[in-house]
Amino acid sequence: MIGLDTNVLARYYVANADAPGKRQSLAAKQLLESGKRLLVSKTVVLELEWVLRGYYKSLPAEVQAVYAHLLSLPNVEVEDRPAVELAVAALAQGFDFADALHHASYRQCTSVATFDTRSFARRAQAAGWKPRVDLLKDSAI
């Protein structure tokens, strides 16, 4: 089995105009489509979303399409696939991918504690996500 780094997946999914980028894209395509057993870690999944969204300015629907394709490849194993699938579904609902992946990774817990005030806790509760998301308050020590 071969573990894939984020840059291999980025080169596979994003067209590059320069000569080195084209060569790397071809090498990535050959590897991913070779039938060899490949592994994508959860951290690479998370970093890929950041690269697609942050660097390449991909829209959420484009990121979802990348993950739908990646998850459909029979020779690619994705670490904690159920968590990744939940996070991709949450992205489709407008949730932040990283927040959703963190939450999905804690599915065996009774709750998730956060200081995140960007409404993640409220939205997760409204969506009925389990485990519940608890917003911690600052405390004076």
Task: Write out the residue ranges for each language-model feature.
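Active-site flanking residues adjacent to catalytic metal/cofactor-binding acidic residues
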Residues: 4, 46, 115
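Active-site neighborhoods of divalent-metal-dependent phosphate/nucleic-acid chemistry enzymes
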Residues: 73-118
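Active-site-proximal, substrate-binding regions of enzyme catalytic domains
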Residues: 29, 43, 47-75, 82
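Short, well-structured N-terminal submotif of metal-dependent ribonuclease cores
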Residues: 1-40, 55-62, 127-141
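Acidic, PIN/NYN-like endoribonuclease modules and their adjacent C-terminal/linker elements
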Residues: 107-141
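Active-site phosphate/pyrophosphate-handling residues
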Residues: 7, 26, 43, 49, ...
